[in-house]
Amino acid sequence: MVSLKIKKILLLVSLLNAIEAYSNDTIYSTSYNNGIESTPSYSTSAISSTGSSNKENAITSSSETTTMAGQYGESGSTTIMDEQETGTSSQYISVTTTTQTSDTMSSVKKSTEIATPSSSIVPTPLQSYSDESQISQTLSHNPKSVAESDSDTTSSESSSSVIISTSDSSAVPREISPIITTDSQISKEEGTLAQTSSISETTRIAQMVTRVSQISSITAASTIDGFSSESTQTDFSNTVSFENSVEEEYAMSKSQLSESYSSSSTVYSGGESTADKTSSSPITSFSSSYSQTTSTETSESSRVAVGVSRPSSITQTTSIDSFSMSEVELSTYYDLSAGNYPDQELIVDRPATSSTAETSSEASQGVSRESNTFAVSSISTTNFIVSSASDTVVSTSSTNTVPYSSVHSTFVHATSSSTYISSSLYSSPSLSASVSSHFGVAPFPSAYISFSSVPVAVSSTYTSSPSASVVVPSAYASSPSVPVAVSSTYTSSPSAPAAISSTYTSSPSAPVAVSSTYTSSPSAPAAISSTYTSSPSAPVAVSSTYTSSPSAPAAISSTYTSSPSAPVAVSSTYTSSPSAPVAISSTYTSSPSVPVAVSSTYTSSPSAPAAISSTYTSSPSAPVAVSSTYTSSPSAPAAISSTYTSSPSVPVAVSSTYTSSPSAPAAISSTYTSSPSVPVAVSSTYTSSPSAPAAISSTYTSSPSAPVAVSSTYTSSPSAPAAISSTYTSSPSAPVAVSSTYTSSPSAPAAISSTYTSSPSAPVAVSSTYTSSPSALVVLSSTSTSSPYDIVYSPSTFAAISSGYTPSPSASVAMSSTSSSSPYDIVYSLSSSASRSSIATYEFSPSPSTSLPTSSTYTYFSSAYAFEFSSERYSTTSTIAPTQIHSTLSRITDFLLQTSMAIQSIVSQQISTSSTLNDEIHSSALSVFNPSASNLVETSLIISSTQASITSPKNSAKISSLQSQLSSSTKNPYDTANKNTETSGRSTVVSNFLYTSSAAKPDNEKFSATPTEITTISSSSHAYSLSIPSSHNSVTGLSHNFVDSSKSATSFGYSSSSISSIKLSKETIPASKSVSNTQERITSFTSTLRANSQSEKSEGRNSVGSLQSSHISSNPSLSTNTKVDSKSLSRKVSKTMGENGEETGLTTTKTQYKSSSETSGSYSRSFTKISIGPATTAVQTQASTNSVFTAPALSTYPTTPYPSPNSYAWLPTAIIVESSETGPTTASFNPSITGSLPNAIEPAVAVSEPINHTLITIGFTAALNYVFLVQNPLSSAQIFNFLPLVLKYPFSNTSSELDNSIGELSTFILSYRSGSSTTTLSPKSISSLSVVKKKKNQQKKNATKSTEDLHPPQVDTSSIAVKKIVPMVDSSKAYIVSVAEVYFPTEAVTYLQQLILDENSTLYSNPQTPLRSLAGLIDSGIPLGGLTLYGSGDGGYVPSLTSSSVLDSSKGNSQNIDGTYKYGALDDFINSFTDSASAGKYAVKIIIFLIVLTIGVLLWLFVAFFAFRHRNILLKRHPRNCIGKSLNNERELESTELSRSSSGNQVYNEKPPESENESVYSAVDDHYIVTGENTVYNTIHRLHYTINDDGDLLYRDAIPLDFDQTNGDDGSGIDSIVRDCVYDKNQDATEAFLNDEESISGILDVDENGDIRLYDSYSDNEESNSFHLPDEVIENYNKNHLCETKLHGLGTESCTTDDPDTGNQITNEFSTGSQTCLPSTAYTTPLHTNSIKLHTLRYTESSLPKPNQTLFSNLEDLEIEDIDDNGSVSDVHIEELDALDEELYKRMSKVIKQQNHQTTKI
């Protein structure tokens, strides 16, 4: 338990440190009208509705049973019992579980819907009542009490008021609608900041309610085979007319909890609930109640669904004529986990008096199909918008229909099928509305929509027909025999539009006349006209006129005449000077026989015009090499025209370079004519001036037999638009390959139009790339008119066109196309082949006299953001309000997203779906246009989304049940800013959604965004999905009701109040993390209209255990009586929260019981939200908003991104270090590894030593070891660039220096790559640290002097630079240390050393996270100035330098009071060398001790060896024995075990002379007789023994004196035999134990010294000599266990003995298999009786079985041979009793002989 608590405390400290880290790094500010963020990671909501009619009805439901312990499981069951089939019940359960790791977040939604047939009609008379509710709430925090226990919150509610109170001392009253809020907080030890604010606004309106509802039949059916299911539901028809008296209130609460953990759950009057987990952030809640006016509500719904391979979606349409509702919930917080987010509610208005009927059907087949049919009434027009948006495309379409027109659209998807059919729409004739909206989305966080003020009008018309020419104004006509007339107009100038007109006429047999006019000057239009006439048999006449000067137009005319047989005469006139025109005339004459080589140089002066005339003549047999250089004056434009004519047999290579003056535009025209047999390769580069636009026109004419390859690059000026027109004409037999690149200026839009005309027999391959400017839109417009035969290309050609568009970060590209239809039907087919095929077909069938203009806008982004991406965008806008629009997007991942949206006023919704492999990403964005409100609301949202995987049910269910499951959706944090301005005009809400992307998988990064869900407006709205039991897919269907309140006339009173309080305190209290909350709420509401009654009872219990922290908030249900005569509701909710540090367990059980009578109906909703937050996950958000409340932090750091100059743009600012998972690069100390590494890492540019600088050394920890730096150049580059900034920061004494330092870094980037060898330091990867702290060495812990009291020296830090990085091998470290050599100011080295050794110095508190992270990686054990002290002159290093060599800095301070060091931190290191003598003394002592210890061990081993050897010699000898073989050989001594506790057990065996199979007898059974309790007598030794608890025999006394008398008087008694055989006079005193009063005196002879006399010989007839042993001798003998004998095989109890040598137990087993010991009462007659004869005792057989022979089979046999009396005996017991044992062995044989002799006599 102690270790478990320690783990919990460490986990809590880690979490609080992570909170501190982000609190110190970022300032978050917001106000009550700012955005919403709420992320409970687990939420459960249940909605149940029950109605009955006139009969008893019992319902038992167990809506949810959830168990969560590491994984998630859910089960639900419902039991319905109806006595009559007149009741209906439906239940909706939604459970959302969200789990977030460092990078991913998954979400699962499930819902279950069970329906039974029922029908009831409930008319209710007019009701009138008034209700007012107030709430009083206290919300504060006491830092001292938080650590001891959490705030206990209790609430009570009645019909008049709701009171919420806490145990805190401060309170803020409020007056709002009923809201129940529960907060629990956990505080850290540092302190708490509490802040509370409230604003109350109240509006009261009287209300009247009248409602008539009819619930139709609901049926559900499903088949068990899994291939088909059918569900038909006819929902309710509801008509409501009512007036409400509703309070409209706004309340905001804000609580700033510094270093605290807060969990709150709130239920609002509108039925919504939120749950927040906050940390170091303000919590703001803002809500408003809804208002209703007199209206009529009619709702009809019909649902039909048939599914084969995938489930079907049921859609519902509800129309409400007049209804309004407004509810806003705001919560701003900083969360440690992700979860649910508030919903966005739409406000829609439109004129009333309309009825809608719609029928929708869906069928799933092998191919997905969707069909929508709209029928419009006679005088109505339709206006609607459907916007389907993804990361790249936004489309908006507008359709105008006429009376009795219909629109039919079909979408065909190759991989899935889905068809939707919607019925006609009927509308009143007086309804009309029109609106158009445009949305642009860019895949960048900082993107925004920018509409340029410069008009760009581009119009093109194409007409193609192979056999007939079509004369159309503004059209192209191309045929083999008819020329083509083309006219185009471009407008591009910001201040003066430019009119450009071009006409091209092409024919094989007719000359081509081209006329162009360009106008480009900002202040004076320029008229430029060019005419080109080309013919194979006629000369070409070209005339050009250019006007380009800003103040004086220039007239330039050129004429070229070319002929194969005649020379070319060229006359040119140029006017270029601003004040004086310059006339330049040039004539070129070519002769077939004389080559001309001409080189000319032109120089124009600013003040004098130059007239230059040149003549070139080339011959057909020699090439002409022409080199020209033109230099224009700075103040005058230059107009240059050149013409090159080559001979028929020699190609001409021409290279030209033009340089324009900075202040004047340049007009350049070039014409190239090549020979029929040689191709011409032309390369041109044009550079325009920065201040004037450039108009450039080029024409290329190719010969019939050779292709022309042209490559052009255009660069426009930054301040003026460019109008560029190009025309390409290819020969009939050769293809033309054209590649163009356009770059637009950053401040002006560019209008680009391209026309390609292909010959009938050759294909055209065109590739174009467009790059837009960052701040302007590029509008591309194309218009096509088709012939009645619908032929676009000629029959024998194909066109392969590939286009890629790359938008700027802040602008989108809008392409608009407009089509006008002929009287016939037109079919447009769009086919795209990618990872999947999608075909969209539109069919328009208007009346013969109707025009159907359609406008579509497509916004494309770069294909780099869409890998394997395909999406469709459909958007239409009409002039009446449609009823329903369905959009279906199907993908290969078996995911069907079906969205149904009812648009009564002007509402657009953007839906997009993209897929990669099996990942689904879908997004949705909303915008609202409200024309009838009283104020102007502007809303902007920032949405970030994370993709969630799809779960599909795969198990079959019952046939009678209908299960529906919601597909997973993405959760989005919102940041909303609202600005309300009261006005008398219209109200417009514009929502711009800017998307940021999040990757679901590392390999497939996509971006998408979608709100959590669409807010349901009225009670008839549902959010559901249908899943067939055997299906493998899931479908989501959403239905919306949009209502109108334009006819509502309400008057309201307004009042507001604001109260705020701030309390700041700081305490140091140990952190606690235990929460126990019990909330009890009893709600009663009684309204009596009739004598009927209804009761409802529900109870819920929640218990949760979490690894880090668990919070449960349970809110009572909010009940509303609609049609009830009498109602009594009682509900009690108790909440208990527990915590388990090892597991996470969640158990939720809900039980509801309800009984009702008479006609009644009720509707209840209950919400339970449970938040479980991870302990170590932190997300950093940097934002800056103009807000009212600013959250203070303990340490304030800049939060604005820093500019990124070009010098560091390529270098990531996230510090790259080696991941801790991979471990150090070198596992152990291996100095030889440096042989394969470079000697140093140097920068690209060598660093020279500045003046007054010293070369110091900075070492780094293992995260930046040398091997890692060699393998990761970016990491070493960060040291070269960022380490000087780290060292400069403590010496920056002015704000400008700090700002300059800050400006040198780019924006900090959060990045983390798990599992890789390289990671980046970011708040995510170091979330367990409050700030990036260093690993402190022992030296830093002992530091006594802080650098806070010191003042940094005033030095110039601009020259600090890193010279190189070198390796250093340290035997105490398992890696190669990286040491950076830095040039540092000499006078500041001492102060820098103090900063490094002080853990609280400013060096480690850099406000920039990258620099602070790098400072935390500095190893303070590496000295600054001593690594090169004992090395070579070039900076060699001490090879075994360790951090321990650097002594305590306090010692250095005591020795150097003035604060100066000679060698910096190496002073103590140098001093350690001077103390080497004292250190050597200790080493000598240790060596001497080791030598003495070794010698002692060797001596001990030597003595033990000789003792063991002596023992083995004694064992080899055979001991003498007095025991002889029996004369009759009847019994042989098999074994005798003598046990002595001091030396272990020894077993001796004497083998009989017979074979081993013969029967043997144990001497133990023959010679031991039980004489009493725990006593035994030995008949051989004639000794009396006592048996102890271990089974050992202790010597007791000898045989009684009268024992020999029973054997006769011949003097041959046993005592005399024992005395004569066993003892002699020289024997030492025998130790024995005599506990009997009867001593056998006279048997043993004891001398005056107490010694026993033993005699060597005896006589059979000699009388026994009595002798006596002293008691102390015998007692001492027994104490030493020198006479213990253990008997085996006696008794019936289990007896075991431990073998001290082997550690095993030796068990004496007998043949019967049982274990026996000596019994306590085996014999009743004691041995002391005189009636027992010796021979009788000897031959008395024991009743116990003989020992098993196998017991001794594994024991070592010891042969006892006959020995004489004079032989020596070697005893195996090397003890002090050797003499006694020897005598016993000598006398044993004599005893046996005497015994046998007595037996023979008898």
Swiss-Prot record:
Listed InterPro entries: MSB2 (IPR039295)
Polar residues composition-biased segments: 54-81, 113-143, 970-984, 1071-1123
Biological source species: Saccharomyces cerevisiae (strain ATCC 204508 / S288c) (Baker's yeast)
GO cellular component, one term: cell surface
Disordered, as annotated region: 47-176, 261-311, 961-984, 1067-1165, 1534-1559
Upper taxonomic lineage: Eukaryota, Fungi, Dikarya, Ascomycota, Saccharomycotina
Signal peptide residues on this chain, from the entry's feature table: 1-21
Record-level Gene Ontology MF annotations: osmosensor activity
PTM annotation, UniProt: Could be O-glycosylated in the serine/threonine-rich domain.
Stated name of the protein: Signaling mucin HKR1
Underlying gene: HKR1
Induction (free text): Expression is highly increased during spheroplast regeneration.
